[in-house]
Amino acid sequence: MKLSELKTGESGVIVKVSGHGGFRKRVIEMGFIKGKKVDVLLNAPLQDPVKYKIMGYEVSLRHSEADHIEVVSIDEAKHDAELSKADAEDRQQVMNSQIVDTNDNDELALGDKMLVAEKKDNASNEAIAEQEAERLHHVINVALVGNPNCGKTSLFNFASGAHERVGNYSGVTVDAKVGEADFNGYHFNLVDLPGTYSLSAYSPEELYVRKQLIEHTPDIVINVIDTSNLERNLYLTTQLIDMHIRMVCALNMFDETEKRGDNIDYDKLGELFGISMIPTVFTNGRGVDKLFETIIELYEGKEDTNAHYRHIHINHGHEIEHGIEHIQKYLKVDDSIRQRYSTRYLSIKLLENDKHAEEYVSHLKSAKEIFAARDEAAKRVKEETLEDSETAIMDAKYGFIHGALQEAGYEPGKAKDTYQITHLIDRILTNKYVGFPIFILLLFI
């Protein structure tokens, strides 16, 4: 349940805090961390904000902020424990009724069991809630995001045991596919989102993925990358970084790049992007264990001790960065924005003249000031780069990617194309002279 659902006088134990980068960090710094007890002290006359007590001091949160904090109600945990105890006692009575010949040892054993049960009954309600919170904390919500045909569905199938079709065709991954997996004591809820080249909301797939990431923020995103086309795939990675969400990259089809002889220091590339990049081959499971181990490390907050787990800002150049900062000043005035979006991400989208971002901002009280700041920033970018702001941002992202690949020593291999046979078949089947006769022939086979 959410912290906002607790009523005055009730208590709970925190399971996890969701939400985007800056907002999530601020809430955690206020003391709302896993395993801590929180008491609801007082609701304001208009029911907002709500005063809480945590770690010995009082703090107020809006309901919209408390919606991002998952808790276990101490009263509910006690109730569930009592139901479990009642079920256990019923089972014991059934077992006892089946015993015909008993003796003192049996009675003693039963007495010992009752004594153990009594000791368990004396456990505090808070301890019960803490145990339940710990159990729920071991549930990780993961979203799979990547370009079409990058191997997302193959990972989904391998990890969850599902049998989704692979391929970017109508009817395949048109909406989110949900599955489950267990690894090293953690339970993973997996969501396979539609393949998309960007988060620009020009297509239904792009809009759907973006909406899911914003409205149903996952604990971790697995950005699946087709390693045979790094530059194109990493463009989506830069946009996910803008959203300030925790992420791990799976460098999929890594065996194909090895066969081709590609050279890349993926460890260095990960440092430059601030993300762990794990070589994988989902068709045979190579790298999957390492991928899920890395997800657990990131989820448990070990990023501070690892250079790969650091949030970076893609440098778009002086004038664009100045424009982003200028817009952010006006966005940060409204706290409700920070609960839903990274203000940097929203600033970039406004500079790109994104219609959905504009629609969201148009309903804010400060909409006029925000749009004025955006227009001023876009004008400066145009004067500086001689390009509209959307094109300038795209060029800057590809410039960052190109520089990172160079620094990571990326060189394409000289071996023959591993898809040479596939490409040859494609050329034959799409030939205007022989393709149609082959199609007719196949219809009659």
What annotation goes with each model-predicted range?
Residues 1-91:
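Compact, glycine-rich, soluble single-domain proteins
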Residues 106-198:
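Conserved G1/Walker A P-loop phosphate-binding module
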Residues 181-184, 208-277:
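Conserved C-terminal guanine-recognition region of P-loop GTPase G domains, centered on the G4
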Residues 257-312:
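Canonical P-loop GTPase G-domain recognition
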